[in-house]
Amino acid sequence: MAGSKSPKGEFAGRKLLLKRKASRWHHYKYVNKALSLKLKADPLEGAPMGRGIVVEKVGLEAKQPNSAIRKCVRVQLIKNGRQVTAFAPGNHAINFIDEHDEVVIEGIGGPSGQAKGDIPGVRYKVVMVGKNSIRELVRGRQEKVKR
C-alpha cells in the first residue's frame, strides 16, 4: 500500500492491517469464502455424494459446436428435497434408469464445481441405480434388480 492515503510512519502497522482487512471485503472471492456461500448454495450440502429419487428423464441439447442430445435425469434429493439435473454416463445408460428409481449422484468433475464439457448447467452425474453401479450395468456385468 504505497499510495498517498497509506500511513507511512514507524508505528503504522496496525492501521495498515485494519485497512487491508477492510479492503478484502471488496473482492468477491474473499466474500464467498468468508461467508461460506458456496456451501450454503450447494444442494449436496458439502457431501461428496447424495441419494435421490428420479423425477423425470430429460434430454439436453449439447452446446455449440457439438450436436447431440445428452441424456440426463431430474433427481429430487432425499436429504433436503432440492431438485438437480444429473447426467447419465455411458452408452444407453438412460435405459437402466426409470422414474421413481433411487439413484446416487456425485459431482461431474467440472472446473470449480461447475458444469463439464458441452452439457449446459449440469453439475452432477449418476453413479448408482438402486444398489448397482451404472458403469457395471452399462458394461453388462450386473443386471438391474426387478422389484
From Swiss-Prot:
Pfam families: Ribosom_S12_S23. It comes from the Archaea. Gene3D superfamilies: Nucleic acid-binding proteins (2.40.50.140). GO terms for biological process: translation. One of its GO terms (molecular function) is rRNA binding. Keywords: Ribonucleoprotein, Ribosomal protein, RNA-binding, rRNA-binding. InterPro entries: NA-bd_OB-fold, Ribosomal_uS12, Ribosomal_uS12_arc, Ribosomal_uS12_euk/arc. One of its GO terms (cellular component) is small ribosomal subunit. Transmembrane segments: none annotated. The keyword Ribonucleoprotein applies. The keyword RNA-binding applies. Belongs to the universal ribosomal protein uS12 family. PANTHER family: 30S RIBOSOMAL PROTEIN S12 FAMILY MEMBER (PTHR11652). With S4 and S5 plays an important role in translational accuracy. Located at the interface of the 30S and 50S subunits. Part of the 30S ribosomal subunit. This is Small ribosomal subunit protein uS12. It comes from Methanococcus maripaludis (strain C5 / ATCC BAA-1333). The gene is rps12.
